[in-house]
Amino acid sequence: MKNDVISPEFDENGRPLRRIRSFVRRQGRLTKGQEHALENYWPVMGVEFSEDMLDFPALFGREAPVTLEIGFGMGASLVAMAKDRPEQDFLGIEVHSPGVGACLASAHEEGLNNLRVMCHDAVEVLHKMIPDNSLRMVQLFFPDPWHKARHNKRRIVQVPFAELVKSKLQLGGVFHMATDWEPYAEHMLEVMSSIDGYKNLSESNDYVPRPASRPVTKFEQRGHRLGHGVWDLMFERVK
């Protein structure tokens, strides 16, 4: 599933405008398993949107590094990462309820207690609920590239959004992006390189090899079989 959980239009103060969104709410049909997960596991792992800042130690019951993933699709890679790194905490945001249900079901099956999920617009969550300087990592994997030129403004990686992400990262925190659309990778690189306070972690100052910490998704595997490339970008907050 494409990741498309952002409304990237901002006013002069960096606040999200509501006119244009980069996602359409395509809720789709819930399977019985997804419906069961939403009914039974959301009360434990789900986080309702509010205008109060989250207290991560209270939310997870401990002090630990927090990774935020924006647009986790069906949640397979997010659950895999949370399982592989029990010493870290993970918060995922996804607007499509079938994906949220699938993620909850998988997390419950794995017995995870270091994963929480939200079903809301990610920009609003970042503005209203994520404290500044609180995140170890922000992950944005395979966002909708909006191929047509007239739709490029819908791309979520724009300067105001990247600045917003930077404000939520701790010093030394990392914004990790991945895309299978080379023009979007070039756009991401241009945007991120223009912002003071980010350092590109690529030795060649462009893209990084896929880190072992990012699982290969089914979507990505299919792309590899078709000969499609994937570009990973990792930028560290340095000030």
Swiss-Prot record:
A cellular-component GO term for this protein: tRNA methyltransferase complex
Keywords per UniProt: Methyltransferase, S-adenosyl-L-methionine, Transferase, tRNA processing
Pathway linked to the protein: tRNA modification; N(7)-methylguanine-tRNA biosynthesis
Residue span of region Interaction with RNA: 150-155
Catalysis: reaction(s): guanosine(46) in tRNA + S-adenosyl-L-methionine = N(7)-methylguanosine(46) in tRNA + S-adenosyl-L-homocysteine
SUPFAM superfamilies noted in UniProt: S-adenosyl-L-methionine-dependent methyltransferases
Active-site residues annotated for this sequence: 144
Any Pfam family hit: Methyltransf_4
Binding site for substrate: 148, 180, 217-220
Enzyme Commission number(s) from the entry: 2.1.1.33
Top EC group: transferase
Residues that, per the record, bind S-adenosyl-L-methionine: 69, 94, 121, 144
GO molecular function terms listed in the Swiss-Prot or TrEMBL record: tRNA (guanine(46)-N7)-methyltransferase activity
Signal sequence, start to end: none
Source organism superkingdom: Bacteria
HAMAP family recorded: tRNA_methyltr_TrmB
Function, in words: Catalyzes the formation of N(7)-methylguanine at position 46 (m7G46) in tRNA.
Subunit details: Monomer.
Family, as annotated: Belongs to the class I-like SAM-binding methyltransferase superfamily. TrmB family.
Name the UniProt record assigns to this protein: tRNA (guanine-N(7)-)-methyltransferase
Source species: Shigella boydii serotype 4 (strain Sb227)
